[in-house]
């Protein structure tokens, strides 16, 4: 689960980390009032969405009057912000963060992820702050410094000092960086995070370090341990199809192709997408109906897939285990009839009672193409999507 910047900074403040004074507002009037509360003559206003690249898209602005802050809020609240990290529809803006302006001397990067290979939390730091860290990692990997956290003892101040020296920090900055480093590590572990970024971590004109941004992603599998953070969830940022799918325990991720995919099992779903790509097609989604491919779940899956107007054909790839293929076939037929599917549907059944399932499909009288293998299914659905 992603957090907004203002929510991340709330957590930072709880751990004693240096953040700007600011307020998250949802009206132009509140934006103007926030400027008065903060004081000063310059403020930064930021549209709050779960995506990076806001500055280049016009979602971050320096303002010098509370009227300009209100105008910015009026411009963005209720609108959708499109960045290089969103789809063409963008993300809705329901909050604006109004902050005090920070005089920046230098930008750094500090982040942490769970590294699967080492099975540890790994911190990354770089002198190249304020830019896309993935680009730095690709172009100049030597500029990324790393520190691995031992889960038995946690982050140690000496690790923070070591990173600080390598970043070229000096004097009080070394102590400040070590405090930020250990604070972020404790926050990461306490709240079961999957990713944390401060980009940029800045050196202010007075030489002090300051967390100018906050990006946090919480491990969805650990949310049951984080009841406090459940209240931070912003449903407006969810893809409506993904949110609807979750209600029926369907794992759905929207993509940008035109071939809908319905599969039971995450591994088989990924393999199905790969083979569709291999044969020249582009999947419109990842959809795992799980082990219980019942008529009800298949029906909802079809509804979700067909809500994407780009979908030109659907590939159903089911491996029958405990649930027999003939029962799955009957569920598919019932779902196709109920939903009123008008586009071609290619079905590949394998496993328990696969032959009987294929027979049931063939005798249905519906526009359902029974595939003989996974390769055949991919070839058939690509042709169908192309109108051949």
Swiss-Prot record:
Keywords in UniProt for this one?
ATP-binding, Ligase, Magnesium, Metal-binding, Nucleotide-binding, Tricarboxylic acid cycle
GO CC, sorted alphabetically, is: cytosol; succinate-CoA ligase complex
Looking up InterPro entries in the UniProt record yields: ATP-grasp, ATP-grasp_succ-CoA_synth-type, ATP_grasp_subdomain_1, Succ-CoA_synthase_bsu_CS, SUCC_ACL_C, Succ_CoA_ligase-like_bsu, Succinyl-CoA_synth-like
Residues holding Mg(2+): 199, 213
A single GO molecular function term of this UniProt record: magnesium ion binding
- Catalyzed reactions per annotation: succinate + ATP + CoA = succinyl-CoA + ADP + phosphate; GTP + succinate + CoA = succinyl-CoA + GDP + phosphate
Which GO terms are recorded in the biological process aspect for this UniProt protein? succinyl-CoA metabolic process; tricarboxylic acid cycle
Instruction: Name the Enzyme Commission number(s) assigned to this protein.
Output: 6.2.1.5
Cofactor names:
Mg(2+)
rRNA processing in keyword set? no
**Keyword ATP-binding (UniProt):** yes
Q: What region holds the ATP-grasp domain? A: 9-244
Q: How is the cofactor bound?
A: Binds 1 Mg(2+) ion per subunit.
Query: Where is ATP bound in this sequence?
Result: 46, 53-55, 99, 102, 107
Q: Where does substrate bind?
A: 264, 321-323
Look up the record and name the pathway of this protein. Carbohydrate metabolism; tricarboxylic acid cycle; succinate from succinyl-CoA (ligase route): step 1/1
User: Per its UniProt record, what Pfam families does this chain match?
Assistant: ATP-grasp_2 (PF08442), Ligase_CoA (PF00549)
Q: Which domain of life is it from?
A: Bacteria
Task: Please report which protein family the annotation says this sequence is part of.
Answer: Belongs to the succinate/malate CoA ligase beta subunit family.
- Biological role: Succinyl-CoA synthetase functions in the citric acid cycle (TCA), coupling the hydrolysis of succinyl-CoA to the synthesis of either ATP or GTP and thus represents the only step of substrate-level phosphorylation in the TCA. The beta subunit provides nucleotide specificity of the enzyme and binds the substrate succinate, while the binding sites for coenzyme A and phosphate are found in the alpha subunit.
Q: Show the NCBIfam families listed in the entry.
A: PRK00696.1, sucCoAbeta
PANTHER family, A to Z: SUCCINATE--COA LIGASE [GDP-FORMING] SUBUNIT BETA, MITOCHONDRIAL (PTHR11815:SF10), SUCCINYL-COA SYNTHETASE BETA CHAIN (PTHR11815)
Q: How does it assemble?
A: Heterotetramer of two alpha and two beta subunits.
Name of the molecule in the record: Succinate--CoA ligase [ADP-forming] subunit beta
